[in-house]
Amino acid sequence: MDFVVLWVDGNDPEFIREKNKYTPHNRKIDNDEDNVHRYRDYGTFNYWFRMVERHAPWVNNIYLITNGQRPKWLNVNHPKLKWVRHEEFIPKEYLPIFNASAIEMNIHRIDGLSENFVLFNDDMYLIQDVKYSDFFVNEKPKLLAIYEALVPWSRFSKIYFNDVLVLYRHFPNKKALRQSPFKFFNIKYGQLMLKNRLHNFHGGFTHYRNYRAKIGRHIWFFEGNFLFTSGTKCFQFI
């Protein structure tokens, strides 16, 4: 199993110039789409690798995904590190890209990536020891059955709303809940279980994401037009 992590240095002058060149000027950019916090770097990313080394030394490879940037302290010769630039796996018609959703929907295209992998953002840190079975059981992703009420009141929440619409086109609403109710209403979730009591349109609870690469391929097969439209947006607003 591999780990995949996305990183960008929003303070890099070259990155700022490139981003400004492609920022639309014919409409107002929503703060959810483009703000300094979306591309922020607090100078703590090296601790992400230290936490992996400490809490998951068994991981196969770590794929660091960037637009070509790399931290100055990064040891690119480490045997477990695979530094991958956007142009190495994202179709050229999508580039340049400042849309994390478009980057994530192409992760399965990375050469050499294991079938089972876990996707992190650079602000998601391991804080205790983990093992393979924390992420996959019988080669299936181990997920949290916790849902939050979802209302597309902002451009960012519309991303989750669109994701749910796609899922509902292929999977009956609440079928899993009816088949396995105790996976949704389990005392191990503590107070988080209360989220599942809401009856609104539901989106996922935000945490790390464990995937199988073939799922990405299947989604592109069934929803290629939708993903193409999303992927050609430089900024994250669909």
UniProtKB/Swiss-Prot annotation:
- Which gene underlies this protein? eps5J
**What protein does this entry describe?**
Capsular polysaccharide phosphotransferase eps5J
The kind of enzyme this is, by top-level EC class, is: transferase
* Organism, scientific name: Streptococcus thermophilus
Q: Name one GO molecular function term.
A: transferase activity, transferring phosphorus-containing groups
Q: Please report any disulfide bonds recorded for this protein chain, giving both cysteine positions.
A: none
**Mind listing the UniProt keywords for this protein, alphabetically?**
Exopolysaccharide synthesis, Transferase
Instruction: Give GO BP annotations, semicolon-separated.
Output: polysaccharide biosynthetic process
Assigned protein family: Belongs to the stealth family.
Q: What is its EC number?
A: 2.7.-.-
What other facts are recorded? Answer: Stealth proteins are part of a protein family that is conserved from bacteria to higher eukaryotes. Family members were first identified in microbes as proteins that help pathogens to elude the host innate immune system. Microbial stealth proteins are involved in the biosynthesis of exopolysaccharides. Stealth proteins are predicted to function as hexose-1-phosphoryltransferases.
